[in-house]
């Protein structure tokens, strides 16, 4: 189990759950961090917890059963807001990025390193992950054809140059090369969205031809 606190970026998500929407991002992060502090106290407590915060209050609260993972499940944070990185440096065991180019990733990892340094912690203690989209096929022509089918392109259209550079689009060798570049930059885990799902050819090809190269 991984615990992933989040500030919530979508107003519609708050509304759908009957929660008030606060457009102030910094305040949403502060609320997230305070909620995490309360959760950690409850997970660690042998006695009832009383908590008086700005956003949350609890009186003689008890959380049972306690977590199986001790002292608690690993805590992961996402995105690159300075306040979120500060919280990750203080509480996190992992940090997760959206799909970004290598230069942008370097900036984000540098900011995380600075946040860790500010609290006397090594950024090497924090695992790093990135989510990205993937389309892998045996040859470049098949990659192009499947991309056209997925996004409704004409047969004469090619994969656009403006494609997100973090997307893993290509043959097994090309996808391996892109993954290695991000691994060398510091990413240790990948959350992969196979854009040709529910077809299984790409998933199976990745499992058979690409994943074993990283074992």
Give the role of each language-model region.
Residues 1-215:
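Active-site-adjacent structural elements that line small-molecule/cofactor binding pockets in enzymes
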């Amino acid at each position: 189990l991984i615990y992933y606190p989040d500030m919530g970026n979508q107003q519609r998500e708050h509304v759908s759950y009957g929660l008030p929407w606060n457009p102030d991002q910094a305040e949403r992060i502060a609320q997230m961090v305070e909620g995490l502090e309360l959760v950690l106290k409850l997970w660690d407590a042998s006695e009832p917890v009383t908590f008086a915060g700005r956003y949350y209050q609890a009186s003689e609260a008890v959380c049972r059963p306690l977590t199986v993972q001790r002292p608690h499940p690993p805590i992961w944070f996402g995105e690159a807001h300075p306040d979120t990185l500060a919280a990750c440096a203080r509480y996190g065991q992992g940090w997760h990025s959206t799909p970004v180019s290598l230069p942008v990733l370097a900036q984000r990892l540098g900011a995380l390193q600075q946040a860790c340094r500010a609290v006397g912690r090594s950024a090497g203690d924090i695992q790093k992950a990135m989510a990205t989209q993937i389309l892998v096929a045996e040859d470049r022509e098949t990659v192009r054809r499947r991309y056209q089918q997925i996004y409704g392109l004409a047969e004469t259209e090619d994969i656009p140059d403006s494609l997100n550079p973090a997307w893993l689009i290509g043959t097994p060798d090309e996808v391996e090369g892109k993954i290695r570049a991000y691994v060398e930059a510091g990413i240790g885990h990948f959350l992969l969205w196979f854009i040709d799902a529910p077809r299984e050819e790409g998933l199976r090809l990745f499992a058979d031809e690409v994943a074993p190269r990283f074992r």
